Design a protein with these regions (language model features):
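Accessory terminal and edge-of-domain segments that mediate assembly/interaction
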Residues: 1-114, 120-267
Length: 267
């Protein structure tokens, strides 16, 4: 006999009610404990869930750690690329962690957040690696349901997508546009689940976009999510190859192009 009760994750949700626990208060207490001054982050920030970008940049002696980033869980790495200063946070893997950091970044002065996550190929558009600008993401995780009522997908802001349309045509690695599957459980990507997601036309599987877009819509914050399609879920030999410098060169080109176009449309 099946229960008719509402699943716990959907119960007693008031989406219009403010949170009693805020990122501003948390960061304020962290600064007090750590003896840090209140200082803003760059207006364009980046989530680098794999951490390869930050590791490569550190190895090359580029950029600096922000000594006043008060987050308890991460470092923020400042890098200037093509005249734009970025704040990059590495290894915030998965929907809850990504959204926690997004909340803290926007509370600290971020104006645009770009997520560059590695992803597994579902639809065989071409051989990896390549990029997808995620237009919508299937909500197969949990964090998005704390920000928006139940729905199948979270969507990128159409105005933000329009602002960067056509910006990537000159890059050496293609940037496709389409939908992805956001999961909380990569090691539960069963053959049946993969087939179902492919039948929906989803191009890749990743772990953050649905939650970040739900956060963006609920909080009215500009967020762009890219999937760096690097693998076929370890089902072929020689998988997980990102390209030059662990994909850093091409990923930075995509990020910088998006940021430059966003800034030009803002002015």
């Amino acid at each position: 006999m099946h229960s008719t009760k509402v699943p716990t994750i959907l119960a007693k949700k008031n989406y219009a009610s403010p949170s009693a626990f805020t990122p501003e208060n948390l960061l304020g207490e962290a600064r007090r404990q750590k003896g840090l001054v209140e200082a803003g982050v760059p207006e364009v920030c980046v989530l680098d869930p794999d951490g390869d970008m930050v590791r490569r940049l550190k190895r090359a002696g580029r950029g600096t750690v922000d000594a006043n980033w008060a987050c308890y869980h991460t470092e923020l790495y400042r890098l200037t690329e093509a005249g734009i200063e970025f704040g990059i946070v590495a290894c915030a893997v998965g929907a809850p962690f990504a959204v926690l950091i997004a909340e803290e970044l926007f509370a600290s002065g971020c104006r645009l957040l770009i997520s560059m996550t590695s992803a597994g190929q579902l639809v065989e558009l071409q051989s990896p690696p390549y990029f997808i600008l995620i237009e919508k993401a299937l909500r197969n995780e949990g964090a998005s349901y704390h920000y928006l009522p139940p729905a199948e997908f979270s969507h990128a802001d159409p105005a933000l997508l329009d602002a960067i349309a056509g910006a990537f045509s000159g890059l050496r690695v293609p940037v496709q546009r389409g939908a992805t599957w956001t999961t909380d459980a990569p090691f539960r990507e069963t053959a049946e689940a993969i087939a179902a997601m492919k039948a929906k036309g989803l191009m890749a599987v990743e772990m953050e976009a649905a939650a970040l877009y739900a956060f963006a819509q609920a909080r009215r914050r500009p967020v762009l999510c890219f999937a760096h399609v690097t693998n076929q879920m370890a089902r072929v030999e020689g998988d997980f190859q990102k390209g030059e410098a662990d994909g850093t060169v091409d990923a930075l080109a995509v990020i910088t192009t998006a940021a430059r176009r966003w800034r030009s449309k803002r002015t």
